[in-house]
Amino acid sequence: MQLSQIKLSKLILIFLLFFVASAQLSNAQETDILDFLPAILAAAALNTDNDVVVPLNQFNIGDSIGEGEAADGTIGEAHHETVWSTGYNASDTVYSLNERFENSDALSYYENNDARDPDLNHAISGAVMADFAVQATEIVATASSSTPSGTAGMVTILLGNNDVCAPSLDTMTNPVLFEEHYRAGLDVLANSAATSSSSIHVSSIPAIYWLWNAKYTNFKCRLIIWPFVPCENLLDNPSDDCANSVSRLEPDTIYQGDGTNCIRRKTFHARIRDIYNPILRDVLQEYRDDNKLSNAYFIDIFDVQFGDSHVNNGDCFHPSEAGHALLSGEEWCRAQWGLDDLTCAP
C-alpha cells in the first residue's frame, strides 16, 4: 500500500527540518546535533492534518446491506467484498471504510480480505434488531480468539431495515421491542472486555423511501420484481399517486391531493425518522453518558438520497456498487474521520 498523502506530508516536513539542522551544523562548529533533536522529534509527533485514527481491526453487524446483497444485480447473491464498511475489492469503486483504514495505516490495521471476512463480517441477510445480540456475541468470541489484539478495534452496525420493512404499517416491529433488542445487543458489547472499549459505529436506518423513488418508473421493477420484495408497506401499489412531483420529492410533507399509497409511503418514511432512528440515537447516547460504551457514535444518514444508479437493477431494491460507494463516503465523512478530510464536502 502507498503511504497516504497525510503521512507523506509529515515525512517531508521531518526531512526538511533534518536538512535545515544539518546545514546549520555544517556552519556552526560548536553546535551539537542534540540541540536540534527536540525540533525533529516534535515534527515526528506533529499531526499536520489530524491523521486518521485507525482502529486495530473492523467487525461488521448487519443485514442484507451488510452482505452486499445483489450489489452487482444478481438477485439473492451476497457480495461481501463490495460492502460499504468491511468491503475489500480493490478493483471496485466503493472505497470501503476497511480500504480507507488500510490506506491510512497498513502496518497497524488488520484489514479485512477474502480469507478473514468470515471472522470479521457477521451480517446476515434478513437480520432484524432481535439478531443484534446474536451477531454481537459472535463478534466477542471471534475477536477474542481470531485477531492479533484479542479485541475488536471497531464495530460497524447497520440494522433495522427489516424491522421497518413489513407487510403493512401495522406490522412494523413494535418500537418497545425494537428498543429492547437494541439494548440487548449493546449490552453484549458493553459487557465484554473484547468490545467494551471498541469504537462502536451505529448507523441510522437510511431513508428507504428513496429506493422506491429511484426505480418506481422502471416497468420490470414495479410489476415483476417488487411483488416479491418483503417491504410491502413501501412497495405495494408502487405507481406514483402523490399530488405532483414536488410532493413526491418531499416525503417529509403530506400535500393536499396526495393519494393513499403516497400517504402510506410518507408515513413509513416518517416512522423511521420520528420513532426508530431516535431510539438508535438516544439509547446509544445513554450508553455513552453512562460510560458503558464511551467510544460509541451514532451516524445519521437519513438525509442521504439514493438515485437510480445507487440501486441495483436485479432486485431493484438493495444498494448497487455505486450505492455502497455512496454509503461509504457518507458514513466516513459524517464520522470523526471526515472532520479534517478535505475530500468531504462541508
Language model region names:
Residues 57-69, 118-123, 153-159, 163-165, ...:
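Structural recognition of the beta-strand scaffold that forms the well-ordered cores
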Residues 64-67, 100-107, 135-146, 185-193, ...:
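Structured segments of extracytoplasmic/periplasmic soluble domains
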Residues 55-58, 90, 94, 129-132, ...:
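Solvent-exposed, acidic/flexible segments
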Residues 210-346:
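Catalytic His-Asp segment of secreted/periplasmic serine-dependent ester chemistry enzymes
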Residues 52, 68-74, 132-134, 166-171, ...:
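Short, solvent-exposed loop/turn and secondary-structure capping segments
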Residues 194-198:
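A short helix->loop->beta-strand "cap" motif at the edges of active sites that frequently abuts
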Residues 3, 9-14, 18, 22-95, ...:
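N-terminal secretory targeting modules
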